[in-house]
Amino acid sequence: MKTAHEIRPGNVIMFNDSPWVVQKTETTRSGRNAAIVKMKLKNLLIDSSTETTFKGEDKMDVIVLERLDCTYSYFADPMYVFMDSEYNQYDVEAENVGDAAKYIVDGMEETCQVTFYEGKAISVEMPTTIIREVGYTEPAARGDTSGKVMKPAKLVGSDIELMVADFVKEGDKIEIDTRTGEFKKRVN
């Protein structure tokens, strides 16, 4: 059992006698400092969604699910297709992929964790760090060397724009933290 404020996107909880995957959570504090947790939930059995509110201390049953390491194969709208080491393919609905979708690109080498409930793939979790190539960034600003100088950059194969260190150039490979979406370091 977990409290509502410990629940994260990707967790599966029992709610109204059905398993629901948590797609989004938002915690706010009321005037008396009690936490209120709003959750967007998707029912795994009847393919419906709902938004509901819980008190932060409400207890919930979290279901332990099977997880497999898989690699991304291709996108067949509205499904992302992943493959395990034994070449079995698994379809994951685009809305269940969540924020991980922005990091998924053709030819990616990183292994994702696909979560299953009763044999159905229900979510994808990216590794905590990934390596991507910088597709566009401005040249380094001359003379601006005081402190941690950052500039915007776009990645190859995605719409992601993030702030990178001033010394990063087009074509460089960089490491990105998928939890925060922030630049960590240049790799090459």
UniProtKB/Swiss-Prot annotation:
It is found in: Cytoplasm. GO terms for biological process: peptide biosynthetic process. Pathway: Protein biosynthesis; polypeptide chain elongation. Keywords: Cytoplasm, Elongation factor, Protein biosynthesis. One of its GO terms (cellular component) is cytoplasm. It comes from the Bacteria. Pfam families: EFP, EFP_N, Elong-fact-P_C. The keyword Cytoplasm applies. Gene3D superfamilies: 2.30.30.30, Nucleic acid-binding proteins. CDD domains: S1_EF-P_repeat_1. One of its GO terms (molecular function) is translation elongation factor activity. Belongs to the elongation factor P family. Involved in peptide bond synthesis. Stimulates efficient translation and peptide-bond synthesis on native or reconstituted 70S ribosomes in vitro. Probably functions indirectly by altering the affinity of the ribosome for aminoacyl-tRNA, thus increasing their reactivity as acceptors for peptidyl transferase. This is Elongation factor P. The lineage of its organism: Bacteria, Pseudomonadati, Pseudomonadota, Gammaproteobacteria, Alteromonadales.
